């Protein structure tokens, strides 16, 4: 029987520093950890879904809730992370858990695996400054997510 891999799951608002933490942590870890974060799954979509209107309306929703395709995509992400870990892979993943059902689904899928859910928090003024400085961000998104992403469970 394969020993399951460890899951390190980072949750926080957009622009909170999740990807930066992941990118700094990954090369420092003793074992190879796969990057199975939210952006990797979003970029699997066909290009037509990645334009700003489709991405927000169909996939990500409007900052505080997911669009219809987002529910399917991110449920698949959660199941894929669990399957990869059960096959013995170590996983690093960052996410924006705006939907309570996503936290519940991850808890159900990861409960028999060595998994760590880590909240990435940053002061709102810092997040909003980062949001303004980055060309790929929608202004106001971080503020809408700020309290929501950490409201669905405890770390």
Mark where each language-model region is.
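Walker A/P-loop
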Residues: 19
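Phosphate-binding P-loop
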Residues: 1-5
């Amino acid at each position: 029987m394969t020993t399951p891999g460890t899951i390190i799951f980072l949750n926080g608002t957009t622009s909170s520093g999740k990807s930066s933490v992941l990118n700094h942590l990954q090369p420092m870890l003793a074992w190879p950890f796969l990057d199975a974060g939210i952006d990797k799954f979003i970029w699997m979509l066909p290009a037509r879904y990645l334009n700003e209107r489709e991405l927000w309306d169909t996939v990500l929703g409007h900052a505080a809730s997911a669009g219809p395709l987002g529910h399917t995509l991110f449920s698949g992400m959660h199941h894929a992370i669990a399957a990869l870990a059960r096959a013995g892979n170590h996983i690093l993943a960052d996410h924006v858990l705006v939907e309570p059902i996503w936290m519940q689904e991850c808890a159900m899928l990861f409960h028999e695996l060595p998994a760590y859910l880590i909240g990435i928090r940053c002061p709102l003024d810092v997040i909003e400054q980062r949001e303004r400085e980055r060309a790929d961000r929608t202004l106001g998104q971080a503020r809408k997510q700020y309290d929501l992403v950490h409201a669905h469970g405890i770390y």
